[in-house]
Amino acid sequence: KFKEKLLAIIIKANYDSKGIEFFTPNDFEQQLGYMKREKGYVINPHFHNSIKREVNYTKEVLFIKSGKVRVDFYDENKIYFESRILNKGDVILLAFGCHGFKMIEPSEMIEVKQGPFMPEVRTDKSLFDPIADDKIKIKED
């Protein structure tokens, strides 16, 4: 959180809980949950009904498949305030604010975000220069 606004949710690889837990508020445009079920537990076959939804902000979920990644957080005015380290198996949902990444080790990430992707438009993202390495403040978990 930054100034009471939830910018990201990080789930570390060693996270453990029973049953199902959602980390996101119900009104988030992207939902992130964790499930732990015993052998033999059944999730009944189902489908998701067509429901018109409005998406105003792109939210990204990144799964760190391998390596080590630094994520840098900025407020909505592009002012840097802290960084976190993500390791193999960690998951992050990027909700609001600005963010950038630096690979600390060779890394693989799987990304999930809302679509449709419109490469011809490219108005969903604005780029700016990253914070200098000597200004980085790593926040420990």
Which residue ranges define each predicted feature?
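A short, N-terminal "cap"/entry segment at the start of jelly-roll beta-barrel domains
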Residues: K1-K36, I136-D141
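Short beta-strand His + acidic residue motifs that chelate non-heme Fe in jelly-roll/DSBH
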Residues: P45, V71-D72, I92-L94, H99-I104, ...
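Double-stranded beta-helix
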Residues: G100-D141
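A short, compositionally biased micro-patch
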Residues: E38, I64, N87, L94-A95, ...
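Conserved short histidine dyad/triad with adjacent acidic residue
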Residues: Y34-N56
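Short acidic-glycine-tyrosine-enriched beta hairpin
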Residues: D75-F96
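Glycine- and acidic-residue-biased ligand/ion/polar-headgroup-sensing regions
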Residues: E38-K39, Y57-Y74
